[in-house]
């Protein structure tokens, strides 16, 4: 209940003493602001607003969508955060790789949204390099382009892990007169190779037009991981590979095995209240199509969101589920749900 008063001719709505206060905004952390994770956070923020009696607001903080987002959960800066690839979240929970000595305590998941992606090394075909072993043995200088190498830079860590699995020593490349260029955005590495500034690049976001343009406009070779190299990634980091089918890129005649860089994990901590965790899980169960329809103009295999969103697969994440989210999914299994 509110009282209405007058002040200098203006009507003022005043809450009565003791009236309940609106809850604090739900704090999301997403990506730089113009990409998919911010879009996903906006979808969930609207769901929260529309499905809380007090129309709870949200704050969407921009980030990198990588290790910084998961660390923000650990420090209590935000309540929920998206990060990609989903598999790297396990490294955060375990304090390994880019999180060595700095694990994120209590890290759990609400869901993982479907995003089919890979971290792929690509080289100029005229160099005659067909494998990472060839790259490691190449005696001349090479210009290499890949993601930023810092504690929060998943693209840099992923690129390094791929090259190291094949025995490629970036320091040795520099010693031979080569260069290593690092970028924040995956497309910059792709552009370096396409525009002749690099001989080898390692990058992701393979479903985007930039990769199609690279394959169509340059004579390049996609380097497939060997079974031994895949075993190194699995044994050292617990990371899996994914197969890119022949024909996915123009001129790709054989499948390519690459580091799996898939899915957008929606992470939180065990401190997130149960009702909030259940509400977010309910969005995954009931409202996925509201978000997915924004991508359906693209073929599913070339869409950043590999629609549809099915909670039965979305709940299978690299992290344990928040207990309340897990209960919500279990209830959905028992009761048929009308999805949007």
Which stretches of residues belong to each language-model region?
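Ligand-binding clefts/hinges and TM-proximal coupling segments of bilobed small-molecule sensing domains
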Residues: 134-161, 241-307
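Pocket-flanking alpha-helical
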Residues: 45-46, 60-101, 187-193, 205-216
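Bilobed "Venus flytrap"/periplasmic-binding protein-like clamshell domains
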Residues: 20-51, 55-60, 117-191, 195, ...
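Short, low-complexity disordered leader/linker segments with a strong preference
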Residues: 1-23
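Pocket-lining segment of extracytoplasmic ligand-binding domains
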Residues: 85, 123, 127, 167-273
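A structural signal for short loop-to-beta-strand junctions that line the ligand-binding cleft
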Residues: 100-119, 249-258
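Extracytoplasmic
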Residues: 23, 75, 105, 116-118, ...
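An extracytoplasmic/periplasmic, membrane-proximal ligand-sensing/linker region
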Residues: 205-207, 213-214, 275, 279-340
